[in-house]
Each structure stands twice: as structure tokens, then as C-alpha cells.
Amino acid sequence: MKNFSEWFHNILEEAELMDARYPIKGMSVWLPRGFQIRKYALNALQELLDKDHEEVLFPMLIPQSELAKEAIHVKGFEEEVYWVTKGGKRDLNEHLALRPTSETSIYPMFSLWVRSHMDLPIKVYQTVNTFRYETKHTRPLIRVREITTFNETHTAHATEEEAEKEVMEGIEIYKTFFDELGIPYSISKRPEWDKFPGSKYTMAFDMIMPDGKTLQIATVHNLGTTFAHTFDIQFENEDGTHDYVHQVCYGLSDRVIASLIAAHGDEKGLSLPPVVAPEQVIIIPIIFKENQDVVLNFTDNLEKLLKNNGIRVKQDKRELRPGKKYYEWEKRGVPLRIEVGPRDIENNTIVINRRDTGDKEFVDYDENTIVDVVKDRLDSITHDMKEASNKFQEEKTFAIEKPEQIKKTINKKGGIITCSWCGETDCGKDMEEKFDIDVLGTQESDLENKTCINCGKDASYKVLISKTY
């Protein structure tokens, strides 16, 4: 893909996903097709979360006094907060923030809900919009002023061990979710200077985009007891003593849809995994005047059969050339296309085309087996799209041992570089400036006899570095 940025902008419009012409910079309109993709993606995520969490909804406005309680947390984004200062024509006694993130709105309520160890754990999530006054160049779904799809989970636990277990649960939920969508990822522990403000540590998921930069697509934070102390979230133990809760939060945003588009799209346009496709199958009847009724009767029955068996299917009966229809539905990313013409009916066959590979096959038509055939092809598409995107992520991840290779590799190939690092903040920041990259985070690795690629000290971590969005 020669110009990913241009391609991405165009595909949002051409595939009818979003309209970025809303008269406020960094805010876009979800169009029906885009919103359906968003809905199906959220459905897949909520199905995973609902196994052990409950959905809630908190208000959008946060009192300035609550936001200010966690100074370290707020410092990370205080210049990006939108403020409500008037109610009608009256100045408000206290300014209200449009939710930049939800810790300071949720945790005051946790302090009211938690009294005893019997009230724990609390494990809730919500899907809301959040606001940040981005001053950098905005881009739909990637860098925005209104995040319209912020899914965030917040938990409170009696012990540090339970909180650590929740961190692992959050990571597993996201791994399963991204695997279902065929979105590749690398997981690392963010460096101290880039962790979530106020947290003990942050685990992050990053995807390599087609232009070689990485996009952060999800994070999981162990908050320790920092916010519990700030908002006085205490509980009484069985022995009558009191402790502060241990907390975890994790979240993802509109960027999931951006990564979905980027992971699977190509020069033809969008390519969607079946789980999120508004139409999993598009039926194109090949119509001539003399046999129109025969063909449409066949395709109507096929559409009804697939629909009755839980497959999202649509039939395109417009009076357009078949080639134009193929072009349009390929651009929209429909996973499977079925063509039926008079000759196919004579031969009792249908033609099945895969969007991901372009493979075309003639399939014998039997009402008793065709549903299984279609579901099998959709399953194959899901599997193969995941394999292809994971392969790209792997092939764009490079192990480097010499510092002079860093800039050369990043500038020529992009992607993620892994190398040995001492773990010291000064060294990490020096590396970012020297090589014009960002330190993504660290992974556990056997580093015996390894030295830091930047300063030459003994290495403590395998570090992931890249250019980022």
C-alpha cells in the first residue's frame, strides 16, 4: 500500500463508514455501515466481558473538585480537558469537565458502594464517549477529540493478588477479542514515563500499521491502591481491620475499528472478517430478461435459507452491470460473494468468491448442505485473515543487536524492533531522542550476557521500539 494515510481517509468515505465533515475538528459522524461494524465488534467484546463483569453507565460530567483530587493522574492530560462553565446564561459555581477518562467519576461512587469485604470484588464496565482537546493533527478513529467508542472496565479487589489476577484476565479478554477480529498485536509493559498516570504499571497492545508505524489499540492498568487512597475506598476485613482496595482498569477505543480496517484492507478497499461484517454474504443474481423470474426465484430462496440459519445476507437486485456490483461490494469488504446466473441454475451450481483471497469456486447446490458450505467458507475466511495479519506483524518485527541498525531498519522497513535494554529511564529517553523512535515497552526474556543496545550496561529487559501514531 503506497500511501496508507490517503488510502485510510478515502476508504472511510468510499466504504461508507464515516463522514469527517462535521464542523468541529476531530469529530466525525458514524454512517450506518460503519456503525454496524462498530456494533458487531462491541457485541463480540461484551460477550467476553459479560462472563465475569457487569455493565454500568456513569454520567459524562465530572466536577472539577473530583478531577483535581488525583493530581498525578490529571497532570497527564489537564491541557486537553473540555470544560463546561455555564448552565444557560449563568456561570456555574463549579466547573464541570467533559469526561476525559472515567476514574474520577467512577471511584467516588466506589467509595460509597464498598464497606465490607463482602462488597468485593466490584467488576464493572461501560461503553461511553470521552473528550480530549487534541492539538496535534487529528485523524478519524486514530487521533480524535471525541472518542465515541470508549469501552472501559474498572474493578476493585480485596488483595493485591486478586488485582494481579484481574490484570491477567483483562489481557486474556483482549487477546481473545483481537484474535476473533484477526487484529495482530504485540504486548509489552509500558516504561515508567509512559505508563497510565497514577498506576503501578501499564500493559499495552500495539499493532503494526501498513505504513510501518505502531498504533496502541488497548491498555490494561494495575492501579494498586493509589486511587483508593485518593477517593477513600476502604473495606472492613473479617477481623474488623480496614484496608484500601486494589484496583485495575483497562480499556480500548475507536482505534479498534481503525486497526480492523488497516489489518485487512487492500487496494480494492475494505475487507471484513465475518464476525463484524454487516453483510457476511452478498448474493448477485445474473439477470437476463428472458430468465429473470427463474433466477430471482432461485436467489430469493437462497437468501431466505441463509438468513433463516443465522447468516447475515443481502441480495443486490439493482439494474447495474454485475461487474459494477462486484466492485462496490468488494470495496465494502463483504467476506463472501455468491453469483447465480441461468447457466448456474441449469448446472445446479452457484459461484462462491472470497473477498480476502479472491478465490473463486463452483459449488454444487443442495438445499440440505449449502448452509454448511457457506458457514465453512466463512470460518475459513476468519482463520485465514487472522493468519495473514499475524504473519505481517511477525515479518515486521525485527531483532536488532547493533545500535547503528536501528535507524536504518526503522526508516527502511518500519515495524517493531526488539533489542536489549538496561531499563533506566534516562537511557530510554536518550534512545528515543537519538534514534527518533518511541519505546513501546518491555517483555520478559533471557538476557544473560546481554548488554544494553544504547548505553552498554548490563541488559535487564527485551525492549520494543518503533515509530508510533
Swiss-Prot record:
Which stretch is the leader sequence? none
Q: Please tell me whether the keyword Amino-acid biosynthesis is annotated for this protein.
A: no
- Alphabetical list of SUPFAM superfamilies matching this protein: C-terminal domain of ProRS, Class II aaRS ABD-related, Class II aaRS and biotin synthetases
Provide the Gene Ontology terms for cellular component.
aminoacyl-tRNA synthetase multienzyme complex; cytoplasm
Q: Where in the cell is it found?
A: Cytoplasm
Query: Looking at the record's lineage, which domain of life comes first?
Result: Archaea
Biological process terms from the Gene Ontology for this record are: prolyl-tRNA aminoacylation
One Pfam family linked to the record: ProRS-C_1
The EC class name is: ligase
EC number(s) stated in the UniProt entry for this protein: 6.1.1.15
Q: Which catalytic reaction applies to this protein? A: tRNA(Pro) + L-proline + ATP = L-prolyl-tRNA(Pro) + AMP + diphosphate
Kindly list the GO molecular function terms attached to this UniProt entry.
Answer: ATP binding; proline-tRNA ligase activity
Name the InterPro entries on file.
Answer: aa-tRNA-synt_IIb (IPR002314), aa-tRNA-synth_II (IPR006195), aa-tRNA-synth_II/BPL/LPL (IPR045864), Anticodon-bd (IPR004154), Anticodon-bd_dom_sf (IPR036621), Pro-tRNA-ligase_IIa (IPR002316), Pro-tRNA-ligase_IIa_arc-type (IPR004499), Pro-tRNA_ligase_II_C (IPR016061)
Q: Which UniProt keywords apply?
A: Aminoacyl-tRNA synthetase, ATP-binding, Cytoplasm, Ligase, Nucleotide-binding, Protein biosynthesis
Query: How is the subunit organization of this protein annotated in UniProt?
Result: Homodimer.
Can you quote the domain comment? Consists of three domains: the N-terminal catalytic domain, the anticodon-binding domain and the C-terminal extension.
Q: Belongs to which family?
A: Belongs to the class-II aminoacyl-tRNA synthetase family. ProS type 3 subfamily.
What is the recorded function of this protein according to its Swiss-Prot or TrEMBL entry? Catalyzes the attachment of proline to tRNA(Pro) in a two-step reaction: proline is first activated by ATP to form Pro-AMP and then transferred to the acceptor end of tRNA(Pro).
Official protein name in the record: Proline--tRNA ligase
- Species, as recorded: Methanosphaera stadtmanae (strain ATCC 43021 / DSM 3091 / JCM 11832 / MCB-3)
Chain's gene name: proS
